[in-house]
């Protein structure tokens, strides 16, 4: 059915003939009568909304299934009605669109939950409940009248939203016929009586009154830019679409016969009325002549210079590069008309079997009106000097008349396809497929099947996807109390007992070691002890010493140490001393491995260490951090904390992140046994303070309580 030719059945159904219309004089309803009509429809819809509240997912799915079958059963009749009433498009192609709306859309909706609890996650504690958005106003265009009615009715029924339609005046009767088919099937399947309604008054005032009615919850606007803008101006949620000016970039690596077939198939479908159809083919110069030969095989007519001017004049009221070309505006009479009719009206003739009229253009933009959206079987052809030029022309075309809509590319180079996608401000990038079918989804790709194509903020739309039932539900969320995970994190390796510093002799992967400490550690001979152990290794290790750490180390000292590290390039950093030396070494480690880190970023406060605004980078890629304490109390050797002073501001900044947790902690009591009594007592008070604070902390746990109580016990057992 997708490959049916445009000639088939035309004579029997009048697919390419302008329907004869006899003017019927009718009394124009007053504004008061129109308002009353709209009020009546909305009140009935609100009642239907109440009735829908008690429906189950199974009932809703049954209704949608029966409506889909009814649409399928009438797809040909509705297509015939649309062609005869509007005088536009092709019968069998409109039949295909009706089939698409019934079959592809319903298949996409089949497993979608839209009623009640749709998701319950015991892990996160989130329960999601789907509710209808309310009464929907559905705007229906003349380009796809019956298929749009079917599509919007199905997604409204799936979500338990009553819908009230405003049909385009030139497609009112065929749209109404489609609405009756779906409504009657829905009611027969158990839906509320007024689940689908429509305005019987054909006027802009009636449409505006409906869109602005306080009982309308949201608007599904498919139509011209003016109608979509009006929908968005109503002060309520609206799902509108923008104009499409779809370029098809034919890149030199493409499979040319397939690309040409796709473009002709897509552009000729329903006489080019789908907004996602190609408006221009931009062809690389390397394959330009081959492209021209190939496309002429498909009943495509290329206009000459004089015919191009006539075509521009008829379609846009201005010739290319003329004085008034900037004011060019599409003649609405050409939309959806066959190529032969367009040529005849423009003042020249083409063969009766012509599928598409092609015109070679020099550039994209106002000077070439045929590079605008045309919604007819007329295609601009442009030559690209290079890949960059082809992408630039495609991007310019989208920005010129179709921001946010769609763009197509035919290529075998996926990197070029990605580059094309980055460059074009189009929501849908269709690769190696007819853009008409690629844009509406589910035929050549996995896009959501839809006849309402959102264009995002590029096209001043509220949705940047193919509109579907997911856009017509409110999702309420129940958030169960779910306490944060608690955790205990220590260095991967903690060594203790007397002379445990011998681990430095046996550990693997040490070639360059930098010791960070203070001058007293040198004077007491502690540094020499560390160096002696390292020299006992089987391999030679280069050792660098930084002993300028002061009490309450400053950021300036840290930067001096970092500079030395960058020159020496250690693979092991050994912090020896009290809290000051270990804190300074941790921050040196951070800045050595990540020169881009800014102190102003890492010093910021936080509420949750796992959710802080600035994320510390992962450490250990260049060097391991080994902390060897020589006093008790701070515990810096096993914690993610470091306190650094900014002397210019005279402030201390506690830095905290699990990235600062040392790689290895060596707690060797040999270093604290020789402390003077007074200093040992001072550090004991430090231990006691930290232990009590840990025990009463709101972050205390069964793991930390044991350590805290044991620390308190040791203080009272061994200090007087």
PLM region descriptions:
Residues 1-17, 484:
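Short, Lys/Arg-enriched N-terminal segments with co-localized hydrophobic residues
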Residues 117-258:
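Rossmann-like NAD(P) dinucleotide-binding subdomain of oxidoreductase/dehydrogenase enzymes
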Residues 178, 556-670:
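Glycine/threonine-rich beta-strand-loop-alpha-helix active-site module
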Residues 485-572:
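ATP/NTP phosphate-donor binding region
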Residues 13, 18-127, 155, 297:
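N-terminal Rossmann-like NAD(P)+-binding subdomain of aldehyde/semialdehyde dehydrogenases
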Residues 640-720:
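Carboxylate- and glycine-rich phosphate/diphosphate-binding segment that chelates Mg2+/Mn2+
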Residues 20, 49, 53, 348-484:
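Conserved C-terminal structural/oligomerization subdomain of aldehyde/semialdehyde dehydrogenase
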Residues 22-35, 150, 228-365:
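ALDH superfamily catalytic-core signature
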């Amino acid at each position: 059915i997708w490959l049916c030719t445009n000639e088939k059945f035309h004579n029997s159904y009048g697919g390419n003939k302008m329907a004869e219309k006899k003017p019927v004089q009718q009394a124009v309803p007053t504004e008061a009568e129109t308002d009353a009509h709209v009020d009546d429809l909305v009140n009935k819809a609100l009642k239907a909304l109440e009735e829908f509240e008690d429906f189950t997912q199974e009932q809703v799915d049954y209704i949608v299934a029966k409506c889909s079958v009814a649409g399928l059963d009438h797809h040909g009749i509705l297509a015939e009605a649309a062609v005869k009433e509007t005088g536009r498009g092709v019968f069998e192609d409109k039949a295909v669109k009706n089939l698409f709306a019934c079959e592809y859309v319903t298949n996409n909706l089949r497993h979608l939950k839209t009623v009640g609890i749709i998701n319950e996650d015991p892990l996160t504690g989130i329960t999601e409940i789907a509710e209808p958005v309310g009464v929907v106003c559905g705007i229906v265009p003349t380009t796809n009248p019956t298929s749009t009615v079917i599509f919007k009715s199905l997604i409204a029924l799936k979500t338990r939203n009553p819908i009230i339609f405003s049909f385009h005046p030139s497609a009112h009767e065929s749209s109404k016929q489609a609405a009756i088919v779906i409504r009657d099937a829905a009611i027969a399947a158990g839906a509320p009586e007024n689940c689908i309604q429509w305005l019987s008054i054909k006027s802009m005032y009636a449409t505006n009154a409906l869109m602005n009615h306080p009982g309308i919850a949201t608007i599904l606007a498919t139509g011209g830019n003016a109608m979509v803008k009006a929908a968005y101006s109503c002060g309520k949620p609206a799902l509108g679409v923008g104009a499409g000016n779809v370029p098809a970039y034919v890149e030199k690596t493409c499979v040319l016969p397939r690309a040409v077939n796709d473009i002709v198939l897509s552009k000729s479908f329903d006489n080019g009325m789908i907004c996602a159809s190609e408006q221009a083919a931009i062809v690389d110069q390397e394959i330009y002549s081959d492209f021209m030969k190939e496309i002429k095989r498909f009943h495509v007519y290329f206009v000459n210079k004089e015919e191009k001017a006539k075509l521009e004049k008829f379609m846009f009221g201005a010739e290319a590069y003329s004085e008034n070309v900037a004011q060019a505006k599409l003649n609405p009479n050409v939309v959806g008309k066959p190529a032969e009719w367009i040529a005849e009206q423009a003042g020249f003739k083409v063969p009766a079997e012509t599928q598409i009229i092609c015109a070679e253009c020099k550039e994209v933009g106002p000077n070439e009106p045929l590079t605008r959206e045309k919604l007819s079987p007329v295609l601009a052809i442009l030559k690209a000097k290079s890949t960059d030029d082809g992408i630039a022309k495609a991007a310019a075309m989208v920005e010129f008349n179709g921001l946010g809509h769609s763009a197509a590319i035919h290529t075998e180079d996926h990197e070029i396809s990605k580059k094309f996608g980055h460059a074009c401000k189009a929501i849908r990038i269709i690769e190696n497929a007819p853009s008409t079918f690629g844009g509406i989804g589910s035929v050549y790709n996995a896009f959501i099947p839809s006849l309402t194509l959102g264009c995002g903020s590029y096209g001043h739309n509220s949705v940047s996807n193919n509109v579907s039932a997911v856009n017509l539900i409110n999702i309420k969320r129940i958030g169960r109390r779910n306490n944060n995970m608690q955790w205990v994190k220590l260095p991967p390796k903690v060594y203790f007992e007397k002379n445990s510093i011998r681990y430095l002799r046996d550990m693997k992967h040490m070639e360059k070691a930098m010791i960070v400490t203070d001058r007293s550690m040198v004077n007491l001979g502690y540094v020499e002890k560390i160096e002696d152990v390292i020299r006992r290794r089987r391999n030679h290790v280069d050792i660098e010493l930084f002993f300028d750490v002061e009490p309450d180390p400053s950021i300036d000292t840290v930067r001096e140490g970092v500079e030395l590290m960058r020159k020496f390039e250690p693979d092991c950093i050994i912090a020896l001393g009290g809290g000051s030396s270990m804190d300074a070494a941790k921050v040196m480690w951070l800045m050595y491995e990540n020169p881009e880190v800014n102190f102003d970023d890492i010093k910021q406060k936080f509420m949750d260490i796992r959710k802080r605004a600035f994320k510390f980078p992962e450490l250990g890629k260049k060097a391991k951090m080994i902390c060897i304490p020589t006093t008790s109390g701070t515990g810096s050797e096993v914690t993610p904390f470091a306190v650094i002073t900014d002397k210019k501001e005279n402030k201390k900044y506690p830095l905290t992140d699990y990235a600062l947790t040392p790689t290895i902690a060596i707690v060797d009591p040999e270093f604290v046994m020789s402390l003077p009594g007074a200093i040992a007592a001072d550090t004991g008070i430090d231990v006691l303070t930290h232990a009590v604070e840990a025990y009463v902390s709101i972050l205390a746990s069964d793991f930390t309580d044991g350590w805290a109580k044991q620390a308190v016990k040791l203080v009272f057992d061994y200090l007087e």
